[in-house]
């Protein structure tokens, strides 16, 4: 995928992101992939979910970008001073802290049993292979018909085939991968994506 369009096209995610609070545009260069994917859902997305809150920089980005969506932020660290105060009391932001987002009981109780469907789900959690596999098994179940699942910061190229084996058969045709290591600082700048969007 060519990313040269960034040089000439205004990128709303780039405009909105605070590079001091998120490394998606600095260390990793993910926004060049995300903009064409997410711009299709900018107005229509109703639920966006990310595992891995840290300071809340990306949660704030999704809140500002998807104006009509509820943003779900999950983290196994308890809520603490690292999370920016201005995202804690927003009506469209729901934070789940001190929990295991990869636990099947938590997932079922919090999302599946409530019938919540997500337009976009992202895993920016501990970056372990086992948690990534669990993320696919669990959160692919709550994607909308044209939903997108993204796993960030994949440590090894060999993991991509392992992760694809976790994808339900009916979703395997939608798998995309991006190796951005040549333009990024971090050597784990690899993305695994299930893109059910109708426009590709």
Where are these predicted regions, by residue range?
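A short alpha-helical cap/connector motif
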Residues: 1-151, 155-200
């Amino acid at each position: 995928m060519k990313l040269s369009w960034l040089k000439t096209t205004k990128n709303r995610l780039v405009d909105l992101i605070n590079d001091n609070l998120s490394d998606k545009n600095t260390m990793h260069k993910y926004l060049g992939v995300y903009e064409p994917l997410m711009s299709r859902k900018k107005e229509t997305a109703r639920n966006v979910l990310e595992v891995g809150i840290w300071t809340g920089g990306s949660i704030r980005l999704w809140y500002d970008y998807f104006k009509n969506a509820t943003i779900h932020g999950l983290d196994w660290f308890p809520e603490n001073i690292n999370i920016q105060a201005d995202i804690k009391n927003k009506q469209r932001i729901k934070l789940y802290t001190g929990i295991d987002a990869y636990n099947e009981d938590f997932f079922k109780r919090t999302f599946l049993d409530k019938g919540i469907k997500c337009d976009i789900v992202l895993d920016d959690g501990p970056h372990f292979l086992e948690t990534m596999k669990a993320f696919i098994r669990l959160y692919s179940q709550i994607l909308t018909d044209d939903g997108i699942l993204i796993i960030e910061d994949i440590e090894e190229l060999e993991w991509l085939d392992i992760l694809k084996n976790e994808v339900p058969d009916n979703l395997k045709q939608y798998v995309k991968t991006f190796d951005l290591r040549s333009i990024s600082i971090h050597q784990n700048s690899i993305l695994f994506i299930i893109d059910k969007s109708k426009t590709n």
